[in-house]
């Protein structure tokens, strides 16, 4: 009987003390739709519109057409916007275990690809993701390090990373 009372006390006290604490895998899309909309606008600003044949296989705001998808370069901006939102939601779900950093990882992986962060085959997991998973929040250097193309630093990509970090990293 005494053990039962102790268990009930522990459960009730946990419910009272931890009820206001957000869970680690909180959905950033539901928690702050304004941050998600800001992420959409940020991606639009830096990606630009891919509406010409020279941009193929990219359409809309940088969506890569996958096998089986029937998109053309003639899609409307509204269609491009909904495709972008769907892609970002999918990436947020992919990184949802990071909690408040899932939107930051989703915005980065929209540009560089999720497997540059997560690793795949012979490609190792990124230092950025390793740090976030271990709880280390000192990630500025690792985040901005995704600024190279063919081994060379691209100033516009570096600017993009700094803006994304400033907008979506929460202390």
Residues of each region from the PLM?
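Bacterial N-terminal signal peptides
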Residues: 10-17
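Extracytoplasmic
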Residues: 38, 54-56, 100
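Structural motif
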Residues: 95-101
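Bacterial N-terminal signal peptides that target proteins for export
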Residues: 1-8
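Short N-proximal segments of mature Sec-exported proteins
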Residues: 102-116
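Early exported N-terminus immediately downstream of N-terminal targeting peptides
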Residues: 55-59, 63
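Long, amphipathic alpha-helical surface segments
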Residues: 18-50, 63-67, 75-94, 115-171
């Amino acid at each position: 009987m005494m053990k039962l009372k102790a268990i009930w006390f522990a459960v009730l006290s946990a419910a009272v003390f931890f009820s206001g604490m957000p869970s680690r895998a909180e959905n950033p899309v539901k928690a702050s739709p304004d941050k998600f909309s800001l992420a959409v606008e940020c991606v639009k600003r830096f990606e630009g519109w891919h509406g010409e044949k020279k941009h193929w296989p990219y359409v809309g705001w940088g969506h890569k057409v996958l096998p089986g998808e029937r998109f053309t370069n003639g899609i409307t901006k509204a269609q491009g916007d909904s495709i972008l939102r769907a892609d970002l939601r999918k990436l947020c779900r992919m990184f949802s275990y990071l909690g408040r950093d899932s939107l930051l990882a989703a915005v980065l992986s929209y540009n560089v690809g999720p497997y540059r962060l997560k690793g795949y085959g012979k490609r190792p997991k990124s230092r950025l993701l390793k740090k976030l998973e271990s709880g280390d929040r000192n990630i500025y250097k690792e985040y901005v390090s995704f600024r190279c193309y063919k081994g060379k630093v691209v100033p516009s990509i570096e600017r993009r990373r700094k803006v994304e970090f400033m907008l979506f990293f929460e202390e």
